[in-house]
UniProtKB/Swiss-Prot annotation:
<dbReference type="GO" id="GO:0005634">
    <property type="term" value="C:nucleus"/>
</dbReference>
<feature type="modified residue" description="Phosphoserine">
    <location>
        <position position="299"/>
    </location>
</feature>
<dbReference type="InterPro" id="IPR019775">
    <property type="entry name" value="WD40_repeat_CS"/>
</dbReference>
<dbReference type="GO" id="GO:0000124">
    <property type="term" value="C:SAGA complex"/>
</dbReference>
<feature type="coiled-coil region">
    <location>
        <begin position="329"/>
        <end position="349"/>
    </location>
</feature>
<feature type="compositionally biased region" description="Low complexity">
    <location>
        <begin position="26"/>
        <end position="53"/>
    </location>
</feature>
<dbReference type="GO" id="GO:0003682">
    <property type="term" value="F:chromatin binding"/>
</dbReference>
<dbReference type="InterPro" id="IPR037264">
    <property type="entry name" value="TFIID_NTD2_sf"/>
</dbReference>
<comment type="similarity">
    <text>Belongs to the WD repeat TAF5 family.</text>
</comment>
<dbReference type="InterPro" id="IPR001680">
    <property type="entry name" value="WD40_rpt"/>
</dbReference>
<feature type="region of interest" description="Disordered">
    <location>
        <begin position="82"/>
        <end position="134"/>
    </location>
</feature>
<dbReference type="InterPro" id="IPR007582">
    <property type="entry name" value="TFIID_NTD2"/>
</dbReference>
<feature type="region of interest" description="Disordered">
    <location>
        <begin position="1"/>
        <end position="57"/>
    </location>
</feature>
<feature type="repeat" description="WD 5">
    <location>
        <begin position="649"/>
        <end position="688"/>
    </location>
</feature>
<dbReference type="GO" id="GO:0060090">
    <property type="term" value="F:molecular adaptor activity"/>
</dbReference>
<feature type="repeat" description="WD 1">
    <location>
        <begin position="464"/>
        <end position="503"/>
    </location>
</feature>
<feature type="repeat" description="WD 3">
    <location>
        <begin position="565"/>
        <end position="604"/>
    </location>
</feature>
Amino acid sequence: MSQKQSTNQNQNGTHQPQPVKNQRTNNAAGANSGQQPQQQSQGQSQQQGRSNGPFSASDLNRIVLEYLNKKGYHRTEAMLRAESGRTLTPQNKQSPANTKTGKFPEQSSIPPNPGKTAKPISNPTNLSSKRDAEGGIVSSGRLEGLNAPENYIRAYSMLKNWVDSSLEIYKPELSYIMYPIFIYLFLNLVAKNPVYARRFFDRFSPDFKDFHGSEINRLFSVNSIDHIKENEVASAFQSHKYRITMSKTTLNLLLYFLNENESIGGSLIISVINQHLDPNIVESVTAREKLADGIKVLSDSENGNGKQNLEMNSVPVKLGPFPKDEEFVKEIETELKIKDDQEKQLNQQTAGDNYSGANNRTLLQEYKAMNNEKFKDNTGDDDKDKIKDKIAKDEEKKESELKVDGEKKDSNLSSPARDILPLPPKTALDLKLEIQKVKESRDAIKLDNLQLALPSVCMYTFQNTNKDMSCLDFSDDCRIAAAGFQDSYIKIWSLDGSSLNNPNIALNNNDKDEDPTCKTLVGHSGTVYSTSFSPDNKYLLSGSEDKTVRLWSMDTHTALVSYKGHNHPVWDVSFSPLGHYFATASHDQTARLWSCDHIYPLRIFAGHLNDVDCVSFHPNGCYVFTGSSDKTCRMWDVSTGDSVRLFLGHTAPVISIAVCPDGRWLSTGSEDGIINVWDIGTGKRLKQMRGHGKNAIYSLSYSKEGNVLISGGADHTVRVWDLKKATTEPSAEPDEPFIGYLGDVTASINQDIKEYGRRRTVIPTSDLVASFYTKKTPVFKVKFSRSNLALAGGAFRP
């Protein structure tokens, strides 16, 4: 109203713009001179001005708002703006802080704009709710500047420097959140500016290569939005939230810091946390709490709570040994009795020869002990009647234990039904193989208590491979080794120097009169990634880049069957311990179950989100274990094809698996040098073992008793672990500390630093018993024989 009057007065030339105080004096003078129209208009302006003191209401609103803004009372300022029903005064570009005189500009000095009408404050123009650190209003242009590509690097650098300078009690938890924030900032930056995204990735990605090297390598090629859709890791991060476990104190500390620095990058980090992270707030962060951290890949049926995983790990499983055919058992016992009688006669003839020595158990007793762990007969009496009495008493004892402790016993340790897995009828070859197993078991080295002088490892080094060897496997009788190469060949060697030709088979070739100790198998058209011998050592399986699996005869050294079904390269193959069946793992994210007499898969195990890298059978043959690049391990029921266990906890792809001979425990090795030990019945992790540094673990193997584990990896070492240590089971390690074979931690660390440098050296856990170093030979395969002899093999790489 007063602005329009001042404008009219300027146009008529009657008055010049004056300060408010002088304008009130002139109005009084005009009234005395008798100018009635001007007196009425000036009277109205005077009445409005006096209603709110020396300033108009709009001036007071502007002054109060600027005062609240200057003092930082933004919440009060917003409430005043929201509840005020008056028109919004135009914002003055000069704030009270920048005026030299300290006086507020007068209302009349504001340039008029009669073409535009003032809008109510409920819908103000050019009004932003964002303010900088000093309380100044942030314009829309500044808001866009905060999301500029160059600010991503500044925001992440600010957070990284703050985490690095935090107190040690908070730094571990804060460092865990850096990785998902880095990934999501990078993916957002790819969509905005690929050039800055590449600069951001190259600058900060080395911080995560030690523990997330596989994912970092996969994200290296992401340079556009189309790449994000095609890349498995990037699409998984984009479509799922990342679960991170933090304490409430640490989360509050982080959010307070980001709110304080909201205008210089904190808002970017806050938006990432709000949109892409799923904080799991706990009182104190433990290793068990962090097992489920990572990308939340949950189906609709899980309702976002992960309940299906818990229900899956509670599904009853039968981990006991597979029941034997009664008629076949009788045949074995009859044959063993004959062998025992022959040994008894031989001992009587050579009375001076102490045959029993350290092992005074008959073959029949050993066979009973193999099938019943409760039977432990160490007496030297070979009388048949006493043997029968002992067996009868043992059976009665077993029945009584089952009655008394039936409720206490774990139902997961019961044996599966025999008809759940169809098997071909037994042959004379199977009978011969079982007798050989009993003999080897009786003569096995006992590792119940590790002695101060550990048994050595028999290491086979393959020379002149030109870095083409890709896999290796030993037969169960440790007589043959088979290796796959990148030029699609398979080579087999005789480890004991005997001929590979079967004397009972006449071969129509030029080598029939010779005794070859090495053979080459030709048939694949791509790199051979895995080989596996059958339990009877008569057949060999091979998986290749050409998407096929081939079955080879060790008698004729020819290919018998080619199994086609996978859509991508086959990474791993494994024969069932019962024979007849085998499993494969492939790049097509599936594992498959096959039988030797069918050219199509019997089961397809689908559920992994990335490559299935390794596969192994349970000792009873009724379950299959798979390790994947999605950092998980799964247990599958052969009879139904369902996933019955999900093992979460690795931070890198799982590339090696081994199952304890008693079927209770599972060990998994990953690309980052971590070995996890799991309880299969509960699906929980028992412990974590470190010692291979940050190098991949290629192979794992259990001893006959299941208390010792050996591992081989890319760090050119074979390491021996005491599995019972730091668990509820009795330890196999002696009370006296082991010093030899670089077994003590100090010597092992010093040797690791000498070999690989400090950057790739990790302090080993206390369950590391011994370390065996090679000369630049990655250990592709480790294996405990049935006699507890440790074998290892690899290709020398100068």
